[in-house]
């Protein structure tokens, strides 16, 4: 590290600044590496002839930032109002949760009290992590997990529960080579079908496909609005190349006044006024029912959350008519989702053609 900038006559303090950033909070490591760098740099400047190359400082970056997609997604989760992350480490998604933790320490600490207004749990396995996410979402928190293909396989049961009980949840799926353990360090869009139809039965889930870190940030935030509005799991489908590679991109747009869209949540005032509440009533005809959050009203708005078949008032039933009614409503909700998710990007041919190509994400 000292020889290379010494030969190329790179300004010494610039490299030292990089060391300080790399070993921030690790004073013993910083000092040892700084001494090693100085020894190599000074010896090279004294004993080695400079290369016939000239190094100039140029601003070719402009106002762009250097960021990977996973970090952008983690920041997007903060921007989207997430306060709960439960996850289990798996390549290549681990850095989504790590980035969320890093940004929460900056943006989710109460300045007056110093209290941390977030919860991040490294669970014992993927099943526990998605279970925590579903529980937090039921309780009104914006919650997510980050995983990859094998994790999605293990989370199927809880994803189905969230779908059928209609509980918001967000899953960041950073895809890798599959099937089975596959190739953890290679990119692939291997999870499209298993995520789109995760769990058994007639399940269908909205999937978002970010193309670059900017969309990782934007869709990472948007996913939480969609999950709340649709009361369902929403998947953000990154892939290894998008998530782990560093990109040059324009600064993200951050609006402190951005309002969170919580969807159809009944207030205590509405319940007190005697408004009819049935957890699975399709009042508006769009398939999306109204929900209440625990503790909203002392006497009204309570219901059983079930993974079993139920009627419009969340009462257990195995009657065929009630089951068909519920499934048809879920289909209407999925149709309503089509108007809420981002549309496709269409590049039209310069001349009329009979062929078309369909691809997903930057390496599709």
PLM regions: where:
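Positively charged, low-complexity/disordered segments
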Residues: 2-13
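Thiamine diphosphate
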Residues: 17-197, 204-205, 210
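Active-site/ligand-binding-proximal alpha/beta "capping" segment
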Residues: 202-225
């Amino acid at each position: 590290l000292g020889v290379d900038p010494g030969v190329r006559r790179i300004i010494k303090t610039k490299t030292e600044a990089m060391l300080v950033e790399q070993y921030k909070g690790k004073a013993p490591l910083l000092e040892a590496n700084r001494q090693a760098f100085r020894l190599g740099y000074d010896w090279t400047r004294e004993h080695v002839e400079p290369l016939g190359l000239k190094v100039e400082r140029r601003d070719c970056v402009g106002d762009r930032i250097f960021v990977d997609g996973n970090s952008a997604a983690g920041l997007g989760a903060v921007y989207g109002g997430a306060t709960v992350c439960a996850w289990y480490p798996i390549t290549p998604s681990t850095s989504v949760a790590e980035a969320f933790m890093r940004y929460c320490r900056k943006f989710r600490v109460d300045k007056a009290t110093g209290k941390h207004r977030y919860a991040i749990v490294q669970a014992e396995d993927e099943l526990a992590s998605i279970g925590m996410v579903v529980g937090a979402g039921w309780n009104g928190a914006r919650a997510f997990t980050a995983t990859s293909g094998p994790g999605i396989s293990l989370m199927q049961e809880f994803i189905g529960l969230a779908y059928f009980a209609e509980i918001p949840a967000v899953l960041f799926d950073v895809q890798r080579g599959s099937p089975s353990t596959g190739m953890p360090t290679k990119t692939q869009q291997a999870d499209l079908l298993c995520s789109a139809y995760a769990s058994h039965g007639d399940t269908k889930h909205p999937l978002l496909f970010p193309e670059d870190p900017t969309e990782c940030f934007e869709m990472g935030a948007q996913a939480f609005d969609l999950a709340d509005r649709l009361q369902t799991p929403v998947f953000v489908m990154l892939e290894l190349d998008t998530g782990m590679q560093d990109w040059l991109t324009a600064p993200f747009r951050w609006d402190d006044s951005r309002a969170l869209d919580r969807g159809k949540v009944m207030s205590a005032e509405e319940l007190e006024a005697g408004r009819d509440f049935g957890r699975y009533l399709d009042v508006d005809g769009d398939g999306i029912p109204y929900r209440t959050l625990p503790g909203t009203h002392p006497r009204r708005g309570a219901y059983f959350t079930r993974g079993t078949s139920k009627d419009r008032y969340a009462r257990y039933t195995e009657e065929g008519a009630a089951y068909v009614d519920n499934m048809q409503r879920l289909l209407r909700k999925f149709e309503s989702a089509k108007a809420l998710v981002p549309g496709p990007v269409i590049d039209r041919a310069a001349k009329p053609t009979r062929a078309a190509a369909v691809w997903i994400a930057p390496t599709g």
